Amino acid sequence: MTTPHATPRATTEGTVYTVTGGDWDEVVESAVKSDDERIIVNMGPQHPSTHGVLRLILEIDGETVTEARCGIGYLHTGIEKNLEFRNWTQGTTFVTRMDYLTPFFNETAYCLGVEKLLGIEDQIPDRATVLRVLLMELNRLSSHLVCIATGGMELGATTIMIYGFRDRELVLDLFELFTGLRMNHAFVRPGGLAQDLPPGAVDRLREFIKTMKKNLPEYDKLATGNPIFKARMQDVGYLDLTGCMALGATGPVLRSAGLPHDLRKSDPYCGYETYDFEVPTADTCDSYGRFLIRLEEMRQSLRIIEQCIDRLEPGPVMVADKKIAWPAQLALGPDGLGNSLDHIRNIMGTSMEALIHHFKLVTEGFRVPPGQVYTAVESPKGELGVHVVSDGGTRPYRVHFRDPSFTNLQAMAAMCEGGQVADVIVAVASIDPVMGGVDR
């Protein structure tokens, strides 16, 4: 039976039924038939392949993804709000926990903003600046190793996963030697660093560089020389330069589309313009290109670390201004705040005024002139920006972060729609989102 009252009309939004009466059963039956294969699938937020508590809502037609959306917010910790209730130095202990795989980038971006407001950018000791670069490049290595290891694990390449975490452990051992902690260091402070490198640190660094140079070619053999790995990555998660620019994607996602945009070159900070290194790019616009870029960036990071070691001259690691500087020249105490017994004995033996000043500096903090600044660093995932606003007090009025994981995750839909369900995992892994940074 046919009826002129219910005629389906195909549009870009789907099939539209114009009904003016007649057989409703036929309308329903026709609609059900047209949407027979349409299924909504929730991938996550506890899915092992979504890099944390990320929820992906997928509309699939058979094996093809017709629509993809992100659900975020499951790891919201209120870090930006908490910063408004702590002094400027205490802020580093919060920001280091955002993207927990790149703590030194979070800390450095925040401290560069605070230093810009204070007007002390030119007063930061050279040794502190070189050590910041050194720590950031080590951190870039460890972040890329996790990305490659977890990406390999999700594809079933468990050997890459084991190798990646093996090498990352070497970096975390160095962090533990330098800062006392494997993660969440709060080592970069406004004005410099919490303390200097311990004895023997440079020798350990040289050993690490030698080991990593030996280990990096293994990833080439396991991945780039593996036809199954390449077939699984090539032409998957495709996003061209136009799409990257429209969605604000940065980092390896943007560079895989052929644009050599890297803030270390285009808008240098911490003296990066004086270092010799290349910005790797690809023209594949896919997950495989992003993988190759991260592999090459690790080699470039080793180059920069070697240059940092050559530039390490003896000197202070904190500004000379005692109204800002926390004690950095003495060993840290058990509380991790620079209040070692040596320091307490030193200031108590000097004068009561020095003791009062130290007490006020730690409890109340220093004042930052009113104003607002935006600073950005090139994190392993892309542009990590921070907008810092001061009202002239001892606490931030507002601190907002532009996290690259959050921005790049918007590209997930463009990468996945029209592809296979299995390729969603590869596309998300190539973005390398960390939910601590996305949700903050």
Curated annotation (Swiss-Prot):
Enzyme Commission number(s) from the entry: 7.1.1.-
Keyword Acetylation annotated: no
Pfam families (alphabetical): Complex1_49kDa
Presence of keyword Signal: no
Single GO term (MF): quinone binding
InterPro entries: NADH_Q_OxRdtase_suD, NADH_UbQ_OxRdtase_49kDa_CS, NDH1_su_D/H, NiFe-Hase_large
Bilayer topology term: Peripheral membrane protein
Superkingdom of origin organism: Bacteria
Localization in the cell: Cell membrane
GO CC term (a single one): plasma membrane
Enzymatic reactions: a quinone + NADH + 5 H(+)(in) = a quinol + NAD(+) + 4 H(+)(out)
PANTHER family: NADH DEHYDROGENASE [UBIQUINONE] IRON-SULFUR PROTEIN 2, MITOCHONDRIAL, NADH-UBIQUINONE OXIDOREDUCTASE 49 KDA SUBUNIT
Entry function: NDH-1 shuttles electrons from NADH, via FMN and iron-sulfur (Fe-S) centers, to quinones in the respiratory chain. The immediate electron acceptor for the enzyme in this species is believed to be a menaquinone. Couples the redox reaction to proton translocation (for every two electrons transferred, four hydrogen ions are translocated across the cytoplasmic membrane), and thus conserves the redox energy in a proton gradient.
Quaternary data: NDH-1 is composed of 14 different subunits. Subunits NuoB, C, D, E, F, and G constitute the peripheral sector of the complex.
Family of the protein in this entry: Belongs to the complex I 49 kDa subunit family.
UniProt-recorded name of the protein: NADH-quinone oxidoreductase subunit D 1
Organism per entry: Streptomyces griseus subsp. griseus (strain JCM 4626 / CBS 651.72 / NBRC 13350 / KCC S-0626 / ISP 5235)
Taxonomic lineage: Bacteria, Bacillati, Actinomycetota, Actinomycetes, Kitasatosporales
